[in-house]
């Protein structure tokens, strides 16, 4: 019985790994035109690597935006940006801008694949007009200091950022 429980736990964990989740999901999709990949989060590199292998020659280019020291090295056709987590930094803004640029390259015939994992709300940042990165950093620091959870932090991030929630449509490409 103990061995059965251990095997069930191992299988459950294996099924939740980002590479398996991405591979299983990609097998269900049809891709048209060139494929552009935007991978954001602490598991972004692993997800992008899996997508790269799966897509092979269909992959046009991509961007990986991940936490510092979470990249495992260069990936062909991908630009890698490491950024601040849990507090966004200048690279979070840089990554957001580069993601917008990449998505805008796609045409109506192309596919844009967005791969998101935990940490993404900090790793890409585009302050709403009238706000600065410093404003968002200060709000984040204060929320972390007072013990706010990620749910509370993300509620405010959606109000302060042009990259969160439905406001992300501002960078929709012609293929959207």
For each feature predicted by the language model, list its residue ranges.
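Phosphate/diphosphate-binding loops
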Residues: 158, 166-176
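N-terminal loops that bind phosphate or other acidic moieties
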Residues: 1-163
